[in-house]
């Protein structure tokens, strides 16, 4: 009798035992959290249904409720408009539907059904999985023969753990999809693969795939190994081009400088004074009239004082040594020419004086003395 009573109590308070379920779903999908009961009595208003969420930080909040024949499903801003009863909750199916899923929906859900003093509890653990974001493929190192190259691949978001896998993409028939034999995987950073001692056979497309329980994403990178000799040739060609350009520029600059120098010398040549140039020669001019003779005399006397002094001394010598004959006019000659500084007056010899005395007898008396111009 006591055993039968115990069984009745257990069946009456079945909700105190409850059930536990774990569900995993991918973000942006739809999920249904199960909750079933046999307490529905449509003719009575004592049925209450309530879903609670306890997040990973231990905070609890009400998701949806049914009470007094009304459904309340806009109780939280995070899940507003995304939660509802999946079926006829009055007939015994109080399952909860969430669409679309978000990472913030993850946690422990509790379904509590109460009617006329009877309770049913149901617990569901929901895990929301996030697909890996599209990874980024990068190369680190030199793409030359004999060098080492590191392939890097990483996703910025996604549910851990994320598994990375590198492989070659077959571009030609017969190519191997496996990594080269001299390749090493960094287990501390699974997205890194080291290719050692590169050769031309390492060239090609490499694909990295990042995956987890929710799905996978991939990226592709091309590896092109270059000859060391070809790089040296390119560097030499660039150096030669630069040197040639500099040489051409230097030649043009020198030509311009030379032309400027020649132009400057041509402009300065007329202004130069030569020290070895000959002085202008003196010439004797016979004046046509007395006025022109006087002007020439004044001009000659003012420009060549030293020559006039020399002529006066010569006249004094003639007057003392030989007196002029009466009736004959003596002629005095003056030198015409530029004044020469520092030059000594020429000496008059006795023979010249005698010749000077006899010369006037052959010239008419009306002739005048020649003056310098």
Curated annotation (Swiss-Prot):
PROSITE patterns for this protein: IG_LIKE (PS50835)
Extracellular-facing ranges: 19-235
Membrane topology per record: Single-pass type I membrane protein
Ranges facing Cytoplasmic side: 257-373
Broad class of where this protein is predominantly found: other
The UniProt record lists the keyword Protein biosynthesis: no
Glycan attachment sites: 74, 197
Localization, UniProt: Cell junction, Tight junction; Cell membrane
Keywords, in A-Z order: Cell junction, Cell membrane, Disease variant, Disulfide bond, Glycoprotein, Immunoglobulin domain, Membrane, Repeat, Signal, Tight junction, Transmembrane, Transmembrane helix
GO cellular component terms given for this protein: bicellular tight junction; cell surface; cytoplasmic microtubule; postsynaptic membrane
Bias-annotated ranges (Low complexity): 288-314
Transmembrane segments: 236-256
Signal peptide annotation: 1-18
Composition-biased stretches (Polar residues): 355-373
Region Disordered, residue ranges: 264-373
Keyword Membrane assigned: yes
Residue span(s) of domain Ig-like C2-type: 19-127, 135-224
Intrachain S-S bonds: 35-111, 153-208
Function field: May be involved in the cell-cell adhesion. May play a role in adipocyte differentiation and development of obesity. Is required for normal small intestine development.
Disease cited in the entry: Congenital short bowel syndrome: A disease characterized by a shortened small intestine, intestinal malrotation, and malabsorption. The mean length of the small intestine in CSBS patients is approximately 50 cm, compared with a normal length at birth of 190-280 cm. Patients with CSBS may develop severe malnutrition as a result of the hugely reduced absorptive surface of the small intestine. Infants require parenteral nutrition for survival.
Name of the protein in its database record: CXADR-like membrane protein
Organism: Homo sapiens (Human)
Gene that this polypeptide is encoded by: CLMP
